[in-house]
Amino acid sequence: FIGHMEGVPKSLRRSMEETTKQSEANTGLNLQVAINYGSRLEITEAVKKIALDVKEGRLAADDITEDLIGKSLYTSRLPDPELLIRTGGEMRLSNYLLWQSAYTEIFITQTLWPDFTPECFDQAIDEFKRRHRRWGGD
């Protein structure tokens, strides 16, 4: 579960924490459930945490790296996404995983989410497999 959890009822947060704990040893696919999530807020909270560590002497400014920022995000335990499937033909990220999506391949389909079928998913995967990933290079 990722997102700003203030305002989420405590009983639901406990259930979310229990579910996370029960599944932490699982292998395979990662499922992210975003609740009250916004990437700008996520980055802002990470920067505030790092700034407080610098202010209180636990961290030097020269120690701030991309890796440290990444480890301060909600998704610190998860790999960055390799593929983002955007349904409904929307040509925007909508404030979703902005930091983590730096090198993510994006597949855009006109199909709306409720109509997205296993065949649509296969089409996205097939296109992804044909791409040459450059990780920001030429």
Feature annotation, model-predicted:
Residues F1-D138:
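Flexible, compositionally biased loop and terminal segments
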